[in-house]
Amino acid sequence: NEGVSTGAQAALKESEAALGLLADQIRVPEDLVGAVEAALGRHLQLVVTKQATQAKAILQSLSEGKKGRADIVALDLLSGGETPSIDEAKLNEFGGVAALGQVGCDADVQPLLDRLLGRLVIVPDLDAAIRGRAAHRDLDFVTRAGELLSRHGVFSGGRGNGSASASLLARKNEIADLEKELEGLGETVNKHSREKGDLQAEQTTL
């Protein structure tokens, strides 16, 4: 749980109603992790629940036990909203792609992602973001390096000194890659074990 707030950890640990963090509910290509991480920011630590009553109960538990603060979303409050429509063809003029088309998730989480990323365009660099903002003032832009230009004209970016800890999304992808490697190693071991067994069987018959 490195990088996860104390309150979010407590909510996940102590409430069966917590479905997990938003970071665990989405699938992001490796080359877009920096962009999506920057765009979602603290929303990656959203604790996802199905119902508003569950979210309320978790908040009460955190407050009464002084276990920290957390941001919690109730999926039942998100139905019926409209997803902003982005003309993909016009984005090609400055090398942009709609973020929603690049990030995967399960159907029940999609309304949340629609609201968080529905107006977001991923672009190659800040120059492309500025060109895009001039033509589409109702959209937000993020570069692949994680620099933001909001529809309000606000830039966000830069880097601090030292090495920042790996992002939630990057760690999630690393874990998935390791699990695949372990699965592959397990299959290799099983194959060698079968071959060894076959050889031993042949030697026995001889």
Q: Where would I find each of the regions flagged by the language model?
A:
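Hinge-like oligomerization/junction regions that interrupt long coiled-coil arms in large cytoskeletal
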Residues: 1-191
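Extended alpha-helical coiled-coil "stalk/arm" regions
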Residues: 190-206
